[in-house]
């Protein structure tokens, strides 16, 4: 029974995906994922990224957010991307493949960042979904906590943070932790985010720790 449900769910996702306006637009514009439009919308509202900035993109593969970020920072800026999964090269993006929970990978990431710290940390990370809230939500919250921890390690004073969070158990506590670390925190639901998804984006500015 559960196998049939998964198949039906997968089929629905495939139909939605290929009939999706943003998927078609991404293909037309040469963007690697529809997620790129989410960052474009956040940028339009909150002006997170400016020319010359240094940006860290966590969970970067397949590279939609990095494509947007590298155009925004321009030739004088820097984008450092990290993911467990491989990612095809993007001109101007310094990509590190690995799990930044591992000491060796974290050290390599921090070396790339250098002593100057970064202006923006981005995280569009999400776990592989099992379909069980009791499993998926804790995994999702663990990833956003890792992203906030990365802010504490690399973000410059008054820096910014944009992170995908799934509403559910642990969300309120996480929001409180982000508000303690940043002067201003806004919740965004981009138009390009699927309506039935519980995902929202926290946009935090004015890092104060």
Swiss-Prot record:
The keyword rRNA processing applies. It is found in: Cytoplasm. Its EC number is 2.1.1.166. Keywords: Cytoplasm, Methyltransferase, rRNA processing, S-adenosyl-L-methionine, Transferase. It is an enzyme of class 2 (transferase). One of its GO terms (cellular component) is cytoplasm. S-adenosyl-L-methionine binds at residues 63, 65, 83, 99, 124. It catalyses: uridine(2552) in 23S rRNA + S-adenosyl-L-methionine = 2'-O-methyluridine(2552) in 23S rRNA + S-adenosyl-L-homocysteine + H(+). The keyword Cytoplasm applies. The active site is at residue 164. GO terms for molecular function: rRNA (uridine-2'-O-)-methyltransferase activity. It holds the Pfam family FtsJ. Its main location: cytoplasm. HAMAP family: RNA_methyltr_E. Specifically methylates the uridine in position 2552 of 23S rRNA at the 2'-O position of the ribose in the fully assembled 50S ribosomal subunit. Belongs to the class I-like SAM-binding methyltransferase superfamily. RNA methyltransferase RlmE family. This is Ribosomal RNA large subunit methyltransferase E.
């Amino acid at each position: 029974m559960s196998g049939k449900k998964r198949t039906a769910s997968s089929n629905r996702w495939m139909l939605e995906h290929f009939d999706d306006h943003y998927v078609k637009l991404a293909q037309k514009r040469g963007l690697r994922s529809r997620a790129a439009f989410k960052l474009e919308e956040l940028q339009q509202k909150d002006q997170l990224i400016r020319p010359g900035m240094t940006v860290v993109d966590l969970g970067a593969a397949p590279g939609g957010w990095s494509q947007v970020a590298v155009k925004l920072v321009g030739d004088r800026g820097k984008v450092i991307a990290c993911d467990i999964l491989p990612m095809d090269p993007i001109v101007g993006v310094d990509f590190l493949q690995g799990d930044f929970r591992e000491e060796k990978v974290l050290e390599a990431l921090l070396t790339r960042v250098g002593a100057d710290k970064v202006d923006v940390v981005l995280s569009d990370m999400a776990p592989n979904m099992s379909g069980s809230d009791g499993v998926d939500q804790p995994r999702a919250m663990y990833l956003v906590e890792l992203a906030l921890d990365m802010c504490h390690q690399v973000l410059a004073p008054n820096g910014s943070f944009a992170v995908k969070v799934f509403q559910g158990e642990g969300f309120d506590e996480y929001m409180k932790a982000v508000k303690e670390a940043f002067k201003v925190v806004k919740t965004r639901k981009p138009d390009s985010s699927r309506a039935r998804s519980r995902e929202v984006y926290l946009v935090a500015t004015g890092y104060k720790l």
